[in-house]
Amino acid sequence: MKKNARRMTQAVALLVWGACLAGCLRPSGQEMQLTLQLTPEGMAAETALAEARKTIAERLEEAGFRNPVVETVGRDRLAVRIAGVEDPARVRRLIRANAVFELRFVRSPALESEEAVLAHFKGQLPPDLEILPEEVRGENGQAVETKYYAVEKRPVITGRDLRTARPGVGPFNDPIVAFEVKPEATATFAEATGANIGSRLAIVLDGRVVSAPTINARISDSGIIEGGFTREQAQDLAIMLRSGPLPARLTVVDERIGGQSGG
């Protein structure tokens, strides 16, 4: 009787183990496949394609996707295949965001429209300024309001001046991104911020203001980015800043998720 019970227990254990091999070890989510069209801007297509491939692979691997496949197709396309995708929108952001990072001085108040910014300058925007939007985000990371600033066209530093970036938590337990500046850029950063204490410094990503904090003291080698992020958004921004900007514009020409296609 005891032997039969033991055998039954072993049989059940084998069934559970077999089911786990079939399901537990399989990555959750679906497979996602994308074909990307590359449009080089000021760079040879072959070089841009190689750099884009490397950058996208780095972003996906750092985001936790196991063994993503990024391959060149012809002279101007990339084929991307990722397993275990639970949030396709996140994959699109990681792949398509140029991640062009700049710090620029703000030269107007935050206003409700581009027209209001122009009115602030009596209808004539100075040639060294441009108007950029800021999406103010709520607790869930979604945009709840848009404001506009006049900011200097010339950046103080760019993403190429960053040594590293990492997600963190701010003084009020809100997600942030902390960054460090390369040694060769610290003197420029310190001089510019030291001469503009009391002014606002716009943190610009892909032509949009993420936040525009006031400079309270001279800054030389580090800073933080606050923008009403979720933890995942802060993590992804840090990943994109570390990987650097894409060398060319990418357009999704085909997308398949779990066997379903969408152009």
Q: How does the language model describe each region?
A:
Residues 25-27, 32-215, 223, 237, ...:
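Non-transmembrane, solvent-exposed regions of membrane trafficking/translocation machinery
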Residues 11-22:
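Bacterial N-terminal signal peptides
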Residues 84, 238, 254-263:
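Alpha-helical membrane-interface segments at transmembrane helix boundaries
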Residues 222-255:
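Extended, hydrophilic extramembrane loops/domains of integral membrane proteins
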Residues 3, 162, 252-256:
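A structural signal for short, hydrophobic beta-strand segments that form beta-sheets
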Residues 2-12:
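Bacterial N-terminal signal peptides that target proteins for export
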